Every structure is written in C-alpha cells, then in structure tokens.
C-alpha cells in the first residue's frame, strides 16, 4: 500500500480540541452543570421545558403548524416545479431594467419581488437554464426528477420533532453540548460538510425514537458521526480513532454495539439529502459570492445546535439561512430564483429568521465551537462579522415578529 495514500493518524485530535477550542472542557462543564442542577441526576429528574425566548407565541405556534403540515404531506406528492421553471422558452422577451411594480419591502429593508408571468421572469428562467448548463456536475435534463426525489427524502427522514420537544429538559441541553463537541471533532478530522449534517440527522432521528440516558448521550453523538462518515467519506475514521477522540470514556466494543443498535432502530435508512445539496444548487443558480456562501454555512451549523430547527425541511432551512445572510450583507433583492427552487417565500420564513437571529446573539453560550471555527482566517472571520453586526443592530433583534 502506498504510504502517501495512508490516512493520517488522529493522535492529536483530543489535544487540539481541548487546548485550542477547549470543546471537551466546555462540554464536560455543561454536562456537570446539567447533571447537578437542583441536586438531582439527569437520569431521574425531568426538568421543566424552557419557554421560547426571542420569538412570539404566534411564531411558536407557526413552527409547530409547519411541522405538522410536513407530516401530513404524502410522500408521493409531486413538487410544484413545472417544466417552465427549468426549460428555456424560445420566445423569451428582453428583461427590463426597471424594477417591477409588484414589489414589497421586507422589515429588513430588502425588496421582495412577487412572482409574475412576465418577460422578466421568462428571461430569468433562461438565465437559470444557462447557469445549470455551465456546471458539469448538474444534469439539466434530470434536474426536475432529482429535486422531486430530494424533496420526498427530506420529508421521509425528518426527526419526530414532537417527541423530541417532549423529552426532559436535560436532553435538550446535553444535545446542544454534544453537538458542539461533534463540530469540534469534525473540524479537527477535516471531514466533509455532508458528514456533519448527516450525523446530526442520525442523532436526532434516534433521539426521537429512543429515550437515551444522559450518560450515553456523548456515545450516541460519536456513533452518529461514525455512521455518517461511513456513508459519506472515502476514508472514514476507524474505531480506534474514535477511542482516541473519546479519550477512554468508551471503548471500541461500546461504539460498535451502539452502531448496530442505532442502525437497527433507524432500519438502515440513511438517505437524507441534507442542506448541502440544496445549498450547492442555489449557489450555482444565484452565483453567490464566497462571503455569502460561508455565512450561510455558518448559519446552517448554528441551526444544528438549536433543537427547534429540527422541525424544518433541509430546503426550508437553507432558504432561511440564505435570506438571513442576504439581509446582513444588504443584498439588493430577495432573488426570485430562491422561491422557485425551494418553494418558500419571505413571509413563510419570518419566524425562523427571528429564531436564527436569537440564536446568534450569544455565541459563547449557544455555539462556542462553531463560533470558534468560523472565526478563523480560513472562514474569513465570518462569525465575528455576524456578531458585530448583531451588536450594532439591537433594534432589529428586539423585533417581536408582529
């Protein structure tokens, strides 16, 4: 075997995490605080649920209503994605440089054009087709079928948010701590983005089907990442690598046993498309700059920590993060192509935008590992930019969503 192709040993993962990001120490402190709250052990104490801070009661009910509507949708339901939105009309009219009169302004000050069967829209469809054709990784002739299949899968593999929200309070708190730990490990091993999002989907689906004691939450998180890596990576980490990451808390036999059990509970169903697929499609269509793409990725990872975002489809989550990023960067328009591809307009995303902004207020308590990751020069310090923007827009953060 060629030594150049040999996978680099992961001996420095635990040291890097604990010394550089200090994720391990932060997670352990969170676990101890939760476990000792009120002098009770998380295994025998059901803490009361927290109230929904930062969004109104109307938005809270809307989030639950949206989730219920997803469950009510049959898997065989076809996407409203017509041939007109993908195929070029040969008789397209020239686009006008004048702003459409059918335009409203959002509370963020961004012009939102309403869909209209006019010449500008037809010309935009032609441009969309040209952008598809320019990217060799996109098969234009199969785009409609691929999107339709992805839409069905994202509904099929959604976790049961109602069961997760009914879990004891310590489960929600420890889930956030474990996800921050997973992000730190994922960053150190330099895994694919798909592996991270799939691992959280596997973990959430497992938590929505099984009651997990606090003592095994970290083992479940590590195993979920292990399963996702086997599905997505060319060179996934080994059991020995995970033992090093877990620093002796669990041995290989425990990891393999949990892996078998989780796959059995999930019936070996791992085909969740995830937000990365939708993000890449929207990036091709909209020609987004790198700053906006990185910001959306940051928001997507932040949403992993907040359990309430598990009630969203992957495509809806991407649309929420995209609109928030466009708002912060003061993009001129809420692009018509985004509603065309995802099927979500601005008004259907308001509640989730407010929830995301609330999560971004205090990154050091909510998503320490993710903030540290995106504060590095590699990601252009995007998390610091977002934090500075929020600090100077306190009036926006005080909105009640009415």
Curated annotation (Swiss-Prot):
Keyword Lyase (UniProt): no
A single GO BP: reciprocal meiotic recombination
The UniProt record lists the keyword Ubl conjugation: no
Entry keywords, A to Z: Cell cycle, Cell division, Cyclin, Meiosis
Family annotation (InterPro entries): Cyclin, Cyclin-like_dom, Cyclin-like_sf, Cyclin_C-dom, Cyclin_N, Cyclins_cyclin-box
GO molecular function: cyclin-dependent protein serine/threonine kinase regulator activity
GO cellular component: cyclin-dependent protein kinase holoenzyme complex; cytoplasm; cytosol; microtubule organizing center; nuclear envelope; nucleus
Origin: domain of life: Eukaryota
Function of the protein: Required for pre-meiotic DNA synthesis and S phase progression. Regulates levels of meiotic intragenic recombination.
Family: Belongs to the cyclin family. Cyclin AB subfamily.
This protein's name: Meiosis-specific cyclin rem1
Species: Schizosaccharomyces pombe (strain 972 / ATCC 24843) (Fission yeast)
